[in-house]
């Protein structure tokens, strides 16, 4: 924001599913997330935030080719979004300490996060690039976009 780069908040719309129904308590953003009037909010309907959403058209409109990706559900929403963005040839920086998940039946959340950070560091992208960096490494970066994925996928 300090450099006037656009910020996009992605919010899961689970209308009709019984979870994360639009305008319900579980749909609301966390109080810690500060949404400014200049920020963009885009509804998502699946783990992949590009699926049937306005995200691709908004990124095209803003002439964005570089993405910072953060969010909830590392192993669902964040992973699906990264895979989808790579097939669209975006240059991606995953914020290493900017995504989270819950405990899973066979893995603690910490191990899930550690595993996906490793996967993304060792991935062979299409025409874009993918990096995993700690927030401290990128806070002064001059990239053109930040994606904040606040949606829940599972």
Segments predicted by a language model, with ranges:
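Acidic carboxylate-rich catalytic motifs and surrounding loops in phosphoryl-/glycosyl-chemistry enzymes
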Residues: 12-13, 46
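Short beta-strand segments at enzyme active-site cores
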Residues: 6-12
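Active-site-adjacent betaalpha module
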Residues: 2-3, 19-154
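Short, active-site-adjacent cap segments at secondary-structure transitions
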Residues: 15-17
């Amino acid at each position: 924001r300090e450099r006037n780069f656009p910020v996009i908040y992605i919010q899961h719309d689970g209308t009709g599913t019984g979870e994360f129904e639009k305008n319900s308590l579980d749909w609301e953003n966390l109080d810690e997330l500060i949404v400014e009037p200049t920020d963009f909010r885009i509804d998502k309907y699946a783990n992949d935030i590009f699926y049937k959403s306005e995200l691709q058209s908004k990124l095209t409109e803003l002439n964005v080719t570089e993405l910072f990706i953060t969010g909830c559900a590392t192993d669902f929403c964040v992973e699906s979004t990264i895979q989808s963005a790579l097939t669209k040839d975006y240059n991606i920086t995953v914020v290493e300490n900017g995504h989270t998940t819950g405990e899973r039946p066979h893995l603690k959340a910490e191990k899930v996060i550690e595993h996906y950070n490793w996967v993304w560091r060792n991935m062979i992208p299409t025409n874009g690039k993918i990096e995993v960096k700690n927030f401290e490494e990128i806070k002064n970066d001059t990239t053109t976009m930040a994606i904040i994925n606040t949606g829940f996928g599972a």
